[in-house]
């Protein structure tokens, strides 16, 4: 029942969607649900969904773990910055879409400034226990290959939260259905605009 109350009607979604004239950019830790919630938001708003990590892999012609292994994190971050800049567009080309970013993207000062200037940044947050459980489902996280995932996630979360906190919208991704999280994000954006 409480989930039903959190959902928006299609007319509310349409009204909010008309007010959003730029990309919605999901930022936050790996495993928080940016891609899944982003797809749901894009579906609700009838706009394209773009996963920055997929675009980086397409541009580099190799998967992200291979980029990290072959060239290192600084090289990856440089490519990530360029790809996100392209995806954000410029001037009138800053179109409506939902963009999911990698966990470290918003920590880069140039990328963060670009997102804050041209988009609406939404910090999707979760507790470490949830992150550990979710990232354990996949074996494609280069930053977790070097030690205990819980310790690494705790450290990364502590390091990155001051950057994520600069996003104007902050939403916790918990056990509720993704549709509920997406509706809550749209309500928060509606109040912020």
Swiss-Prot record:
Catalytic activity: shikimate + ATP = 3-phosphoshikimate + ADP + H(+)
Cofactor notes: Binds 1 Mg(2+) ion per subunit.
InterPro entries on file: P-loop_NTPase, Shikimate/glucono_kinase, Shikimate_kinase/TSH1
UniProt key word Metal-binding: yes
Cofactor(s), names only, from the UniProt record: Mg(2+)
UniProt KW keywords: Amino-acid biosynthesis, Aromatic amino acid biosynthesis, ATP-binding, Cytoplasm, Kinase, Magnesium, Metal-binding, Nucleotide-binding, Transferase
Metabolic or biological pathway: Metabolic intermediate biosynthesis; chorismate biosynthesis; chorismate from D-erythrose 4-phosphate and phosphoenolpyruvate: step 5/7
Keyword Metal-binding (UniProt): yes
Positions with a binding annotation for Mg(2+): 35
Domain of life from the UniProt record: Bacteria
Subcellular location: Cytoplasm
Binding site for substrate: 53, 77, 103, 160
UniProt record, GO biological process: amino acid biosynthetic process; aromatic amino acid family biosynthetic process; chorismate biosynthetic process
Residue positions binding ATP: 31-36, 141, 176
One GO MF term: ATP binding
NCBIfam families: PRK13946.1 (NF010552)
Family (UniProt): Belongs to the shikimate kinase family.
Subunit description: Monomer.
Name this protein carries in UniProt: Shikimate kinase
Organism ancestry: Bacteria, Pseudomonadati, Pseudomonadota, Alphaproteobacteria, Sphingomonadales
Gene: aroK
């Amino acid at each position: 029942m409480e989930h039903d109350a959190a959902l928006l009607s299609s007319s509310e979604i349409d009204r909010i969607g008309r007010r959003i004239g730029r990309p919605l950019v999901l930022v936050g830790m790996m495993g928080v649900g940016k891609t899944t919630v982003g797809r749901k938001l894009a579906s609700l708003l009838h706009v394209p969904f773009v996963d920055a990590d997929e675009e980086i892999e397409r541009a580099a012609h190799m998967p992200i773990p291979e980029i990290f292994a072959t060239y290192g994190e600084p090289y990856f971050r440089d490519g990530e910055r360029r790809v996100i800049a392209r995806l954000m567009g410029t001037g009138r080309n800053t179109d409506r879409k939902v963009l999911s970013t990698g966990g470290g993207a918003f920590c880069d000062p140039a990328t963060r400034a670009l997102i804050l200037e041209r988009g609406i940044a939404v910090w999707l947050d979760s507790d470490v226990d949830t992150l550990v459980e979710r990232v354990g489902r996949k074996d494609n996280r280069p930053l977790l290959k070097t030690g205990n995932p819980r310790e690494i996630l705790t450290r990364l979360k502590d390091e990155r939260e001051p950057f994520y906190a600069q996003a104007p919208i902050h939403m916790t991704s918990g056990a509720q259905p993704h549709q509920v999280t997406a509706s809550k994000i749209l309500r928060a954006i509606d109040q912020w605009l």
